[in-house]
From Swiss-Prot:
Organism in which the protein naturally occurs: Anaeromyxobacter sp. (strain Fw109-5)
Keyword Oxidoreductase attached: yes
Keyword hit for 4Fe-4S: no
A single GO molecular function term of this UniProt record: NADP binding
Extra remark beyond the main annotation: During catalysis, the active site Cys acts as a nucleophile attacking the alpha-carbonyl group of tRNA-bound glutamate with the formation of a thioester intermediate between enzyme and glutamate, and the concomitant release of tRNA(Glu). The thioester intermediate is finally reduced by direct hydride transfer from NADPH, to form the product GSA.
Record family assignment: Belongs to the glutamyl-tRNA reductase family.
Any one GO BP annotation for this protein: protoporphyrinogen IX biosynthetic process from glutamate
Record's keyword terms, sorted: NADP, Oxidoreductase, Porphyrin biosynthesis
HAMAP family: Glu_tRNA_reductase (MF_00087)
Reactions catalysed, as given in the entry: (S)-4-amino-5-oxopentanoate + tRNA(Glu) + NADP(+) = L-glutamyl-tRNA(Glu) + NADPH + H(+)
Residues the record marks as site: Important for activity: H94
UniProt-recorded name of the protein: Glutamyl-tRNA reductase 1
PANTHER family, per the entry: GLUTAMYL-TRNA REDUCTASE (PTHR43013:SF1)
Chain residues that bind substrate: T52, C53, N54, R55, S104, E109, Q110, Q111, Q115
């Protein structure tokens, strides 16, 4: 480590309504720009951002939490009351639980791991995530894989798309003959289409801005592709519309639905919006015979499935906790390494200087063998003197006593900054104390 701590600031379906989440959700170039902005902060060493339909979370390795908090308040000034913040082991535990889908609206859902992997990949490509985030994220991914392999937490409806399809089935019963329109052919759209096909839906319509992607999905599920410009007419034809595009604004507007309802002659229309930011104008729900649901409404459908999965979730929590403690122990042990390296370098410099002074006094009295004996003796003294302190520093770090390595650095007047180039002068003890005071 580099003297910095890991901080997490975020909001999720548990802490904030969709109206707040959609204002801070970022994708594509906007997310890349946000990563660069975070990394540019002087106090931030590494960063990555998880942004999904149910959560936006900022992880930073930094001197303090403010850069992560500012990410939210600059985008949504009223977000502060919905934020949660975690530091150190608590932040590590949270990421592990999120990756293992234990903090998801649908516990056991499979999409979140891919989303966190994608978030880390983007941060790595933007050079915002470095060696610490690499170790952290890869350990979180391995933990999620253990949970998936060693428990049955993934049984039943395990994605928002599957939950949406379950809702459709509850409303209509038999799906045969029902016209179901999928607006968007991305991951959510594909999962919805496959779940519908399994339940026997035989009139699946797909529309997408990119015809190639839409055609491919329609062929996979035996559906029909329609052009994006046909959306107004498709809203007249469909019984159910499931919307999940990457658009940052409403795709299905109130005016569009109002016009469609005039032509439907009092036939009800079910709108399910799986996107964040929302793609269906919430004002559509005010229209007669229109039943609109967004991702927050899905939580009511999820409850029964969650109860059946409670036992597996407890087993998964135990796996996560064991992995968190193991990672934290390794992290703390690493914290001692820079101190140990500097302590040994400091001692060896003194030993070499004293050996050279002794040899210069003895002059020609010593042959080459005698000189080597003096140098070997100096190194042996260093090794014996440092053996005990080295063992105690490693043990202290491994048991979470993070104060001892810092105290050792202060006691011996050595630099505990791994970012300092090799051979550069160490910062004086009083300078380090002042810098530490400024950060706190």
């Amino acid at each position: 480590m580099n003297g910095k701590e890991i901080f997490l600031v975020g909001l999720s379906h548990k802490s904030a309504p969709i109206e707040v989440r959609e204002r801070v959700a970022l994708t594509g170039d906007l997310l890349k720009a946000a990563l660069c902005e975070l990394r540019a902060a002087e106090s931030v060493a590494e960063a990555f951002v998880v942004s999904t339909c149910n959560r936006v979370e900022v992880y930073v390795q930094a001197d303090g939490i403010e850069p992560a908090r500012r990410f939210f308040t600059e985008r949504a000034p009223d977000a502060d009351e919905h934020l949660y913040a975690k530091i150190g082991v608590e932040a590590i535990r949270h990421l592990f639980r999120v990756s293992a889908s234990l903090d998801s609206m649908v516990v056991g859902e499979q999409q979140i791991l891919g989303q966190v992997k994608e978030a880390y990949g983007l941060a790595s490509a933007a050079e915002a995530a470095g060696p610490f985030m690499s170790r952290l994220c890869n350990r979180a991914f391995a933990t999620a894989k253990r949970v998936r392999t060693e428990t049955d937490i993934g049984r039943g409806a395990t994605s928002m798309s599957q939950v949406a399809v379950e809702l459709v089935e509850k409303i209509f019963g038999d799906l045969k003959g029902r016209a179901i329109l999928l607006v968007g052919a991305g991951k959510m759209g594909a999962l919805s289409a496959k779940a519908l096909a399994v339940l026997g839906a035989d009139r699946i319509l797909v529309t997408n801005r990119s015809p190639e992607r839409g055609l491919a999905l329609a062929e996979q599920v035996g559906g029909a592709f329609r052009g994006w410009d046909e959306l107004p007419r498709l809203l007249v034809e469909a019984d159910v519309v499931i919307v999940s595009t990457g658009a940052p604004t409403y795709v299905v507007t109130r005016d569009l639905v109002q016009q469609a309802m005039k032509a439907r002659r009092r036939r009800s229309l079910c709108l399910i919006d799986l996107a964040v930011p929302r793609n269906v104008d919430p004002a559509c729900a005010d229209l007669g015979e229109v039943f609109a649901y967004d991702v927050d409404d899905m939580e009511k459908v999820v409850t029964a499935t969650q109860e059946a999965r409670r036992g597996e979730a407890l087993r998964a929590e135990a796996i996560v906790e064991a992995e968190v403690m193991a990672f934290a122990k390794e992290r703390d042990a690493r914290a001692a390494l820079p101190v140990l390296a500097q302590l040994r370098r400091h001692a060896e410099q003194i030993a070499r200087a004293e050996a050279e002074r002794t040899l210069s006094h003895l002059g020609p009295k010593l042959d080459e063998k005698g000189k080597k004996s003096v140098e070997a003796m100096a190194q042996a003294i260093v090794n014996k003197l440092l053996h005990g302190p080295t063992a105690r520093l490693k043990a202290a770090a491994a048991t979470g006593d993070g104060d001892l390595p810092g105290a050792a650095a202060e006691l011996f007047g050595i630099d505990n900054d791994p970012a300092r180039p090799e051979g550069a002068p160490a910062q004086p003890a009083e300078g380090r104390a002042a810098a530490s005071s400024e950060r706190s």
